[in-house]
Design a protein with these regions (language model features):
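Fe-S ferredoxin-like electron-transfer domains
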Residues: 1-144, 155, 163
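Short beta-strand micro-motifs enriched in acidic
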Residues: 81, 147-151, 191
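Short beta-strand elements
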Residues: 144-148, 169
Length: 192
């Protein structure tokens, strides 16, 4: 997985939440014995919809986002294009990622290839506290975690002093499973 993945964990927005980073640290540091050529991917970070950015260079082609859009939302915006080591994730031509559950692809991406425009480079996850709650967006009562800026008093410059940084879904098999609609997810500004 690390052959074509950039080792830029210190500047990656997914640092601290990245599954690949966790596996890398748990199962031994990558020490290549040969000089391999990295496959060049497309543009560094591109907007694929009103809420999500795609950094194809970081994508490990796990296809979780493709399956989510095909099986859960049934909108099918994503696809894997080209073949072999030139394969890339992208949205189908003429489409953009704009469905009611588009923010969930950021949660299921294991490596930070898909990032949330609202949260991108605003705050590091190790500065966040988490509180269990219920989504204020509608009457469905989705279970959520409120991620707040717990370092606000010591570091007021982080995210311009905002308290609530984001809302993320919390698993509840009877109500919302693992998912959360964008109305609730991006309503965090009204919670603050």
């Amino acid at each position: 997985l690390l052959v074509n993945h950039p080792l830029d964990c210190p500047v990656c927005d997914q640092a601290g939440e990245c599954w690949l980073q966790d596996y890398y640290m748990a199962y031994g540091l990558y020490d290549p014995k040969f000089d391999e050529q990295k496959v060049k991917k497309s543009a560094k970070a591109v907007s694929i919809g009103p809420r999500v950015m795609l950094d194809a260079e970081r994508c490990i082609l796990c296809s979780r986002c493709v399956r989510f859009c095909d099986e859960v939302t049934k909108t099918g915006e994503f696809g894997i294009f080209n073949r072999g080591d030139h394969s890339e994730l992208g949205v189908h031509p003429g489409k953009q990622l704009d469905n009611a559950y588009s923010g969930n692809v950021v949660d299921i991406c294991p490596v930070g290839a898909l990032t949330d425009k609202d949260f991108r480079f605003k705050c590091r996850v190790w500065y966040l506290g988490s509180t269990k709650s219920v989504c204020p967006g509608c009457s469905m009562g989705c279970n959520i975690d409120i991620h707040d800026n717990r370092e606000r008093s010591q570091r007021p410059h982080i995210a311009k002093g905002a308290r609530v940084m984001r809302l993320k879904p919390r698993y509840n098999p009877d109500v919302n499973q693992w998912w959360m609609c964008d109305e609730g997810r991006y309503g965090y500004k009204f919670v603050d």
